[in-house]
């Protein structure tokens, strides 16, 4: 598909690679489309669509002393026209010429890497399709069947919607919200009749990423990302509650169900109770758990841990890999093929960092347990930082699941019913790091903190500022519920794909009373 800019994303990749004069080159072309809907005071207010295009060129100069002796220059530009492609390549090459040797330098991934869907065959020059050797969708030698998404290294060939390298970039449009909007309209009218006000937004994006390298890799991934956030207020605007959901296509969003849950919380808040700061047994819903554990995940880098700079550093040197963090049999994991949370199954790195590397572009990703049955099992690493830390290579993956292996984990409603006295949170926000050595975080509760006594919610209490370490919290888990898909409220702009349980934490530190509402 040729766009208004003149070339398809695939052609842009090929022309940039053809124009390159550096020893190696990596090109990433991304096309993103979006649709959104907003409402306030029970009235639809705006809707819109968007489209954007991004080109990243990574030029690599080799200095003749092996694959680890190289420098890299990176240039990213939006809306690049055909006549500007070569200029972007030259800018990247100039940046590489001026750069010092990169500490993460390495050889590029080759098309023979397992999982290189869309890789170029060096002998024939053809782009591998989903059923060819070295690609996802591998046939089972014994059964002849096609591997599905839930099997390692596979795309489902029976899903004809899975595009190949040569297929046009996928796009979203306002129609993805059509059925949702119809149900939303009914929900807004019901809220109006009941004397409640609903505010919120729904948005959907679809990004097609095309990755090509001078080593022959050609990989493509389409990533749908959607979310809805809904806020309910009483008619006098004194009571407020929030709910959110992440989605791939809005077919699984029950906006009426979300609104019903908010109505119940507004009713809980008709009675208010003042509580002082202190340590409380606390029920955290999945959204709050995801915000805390997402930050833990982002902080779980191998390089800085090996350097003694983080909570995952071992006193005296090394990392805490193998150390038990929780008495509960909990596992924190990522899997690019997790049902409902699928993400890119290969590394896409626009820049190098402590635990990411532009030299790793195209490396296949596989399911990784960061915490396994309560013990620290892996840290995020590039090939370089894994070598520094003396650990296996485990790059970051764009989803996160936290679950217990205990039998019959309860739903949040059952956890409330079995509670003697505890706080029940709605969500967290304004989360900031205080101390990386303990991963102490501070932040605020928002849109509803409730007191539970003898199995029932008895009223709403004031908001608090909290000071907690998610690592320390793991050691004080009393109960872990059933894992469900959720939306991190604080980090949902950056990290959308999560499945978390509600948890019961002993002594959650509400450090001060907050006047925030």
Each model region followed by its residue ranges:
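Dual-mode signal for accessory low-complexity, basic/Gly-rich regions
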Residues: 317-517
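Active-site bordering "gate/hinge" segments
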Residues: 1-357, 372-373, 456, 493, ...
């Amino acid at each position: 598909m040729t766009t208004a800019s003149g070339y398809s994303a695939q052609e842009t990749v090929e022309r940039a690679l053809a124009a390159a004069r550096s020893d190696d080159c990596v090109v990433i072309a991304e096309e993103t489309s979006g649709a959104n809907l907003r409402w306030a005071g029970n009235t639809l207010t705006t809707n819109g669509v968007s489209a954007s295009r991004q080109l990243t060129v990574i030029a690599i100069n080799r200095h003749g002393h092996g694959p680890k002796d190289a420098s890299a220059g990176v240039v990213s530009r939006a809306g690049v026209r055909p006549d500007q492609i070569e200029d972007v390549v030259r800018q990247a090459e100039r940046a590489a010429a001026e750069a010092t040797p990169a500490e993460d330098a390495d050889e590029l991934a080759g098309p023979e890497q397992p999982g290189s869907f869309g890789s170029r065959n060096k002998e024939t020059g053809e782009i591998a399709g989903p059923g060819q050797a070295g690609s996802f969708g591998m046939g089972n030698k014994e059964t002849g069947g096609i591997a599905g998404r839930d099997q390692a290294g596979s795309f489902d060939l029976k899903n004809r919607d899975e595009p190949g390298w040569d297929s046009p970039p996928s796009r979203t449009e306002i129609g993805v919200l059509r059925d949702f909007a119809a149900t939303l309209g009914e929900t807004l009218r019901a809220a109006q009749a009941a004397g409640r006000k609903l505010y919120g937004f729904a948005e959907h994006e679809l990004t097609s990423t095309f990755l090509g390298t001078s080593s022959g890799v050609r990989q493509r991934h389409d990533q749908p990302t959607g979310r809805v956030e809904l806020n309910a207020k009483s008619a006098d605007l004194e009571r407020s509650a929030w709910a959110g959901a992440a989605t791939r296509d809005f077919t699984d969003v029950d906006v009426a169900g979300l609104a019903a849950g908010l109505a119940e919380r507004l009713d809980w808040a008709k009675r208010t109770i003042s509580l002082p700061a202190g340590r409380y047994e606390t029920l955290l819903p999945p959204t709050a758990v995801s915000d805390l554990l997402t930050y833990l995940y982002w902080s779980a880098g191998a390089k800085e841990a090996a350097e003694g700079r983080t909570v995952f550093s071992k006193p005296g040197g090394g990392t805490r890999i193998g150390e038990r963090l929780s008495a509960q049999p909990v596992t924190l994991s990522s899997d690019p093929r997790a049902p409902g949370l699928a993400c890119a199954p290969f590394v896409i790195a626009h820049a190098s960092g402590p635990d990411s590397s532009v030299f790793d572009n195209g490396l296949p990703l596989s399911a990784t347990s960061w915490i396994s049955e309560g013990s620290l099992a892996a840290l995020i690493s590039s090939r370089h930082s894994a070598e520094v830390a003396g650990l296996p290579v485990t790059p970051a993956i764009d989803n996160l699941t936290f679950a217990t292996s205990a039998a019959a984990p309860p739903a949040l409603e059952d956890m409330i019913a079995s509670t003697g006295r505890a706080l029940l949170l709605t969500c967290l926000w304004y989360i900031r790091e205080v101390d990386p050595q303990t991963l102490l975080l501070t932040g605020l509760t928002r849109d509803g903190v409730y007191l539970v006594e003898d199995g029932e919610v008895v009223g709403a209490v004031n908001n608090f500022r909290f000071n907690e370490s998610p690592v320390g919290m793991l050691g004080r888990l009393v109960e872990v519920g059933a894992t469900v898909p959720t939306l991190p409220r604080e980090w949902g702009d950056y990290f959308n794909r999560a499945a978390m349980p509600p948890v019961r934490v002993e002594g959650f530190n509400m450090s001060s009373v907050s006047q925030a509402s």
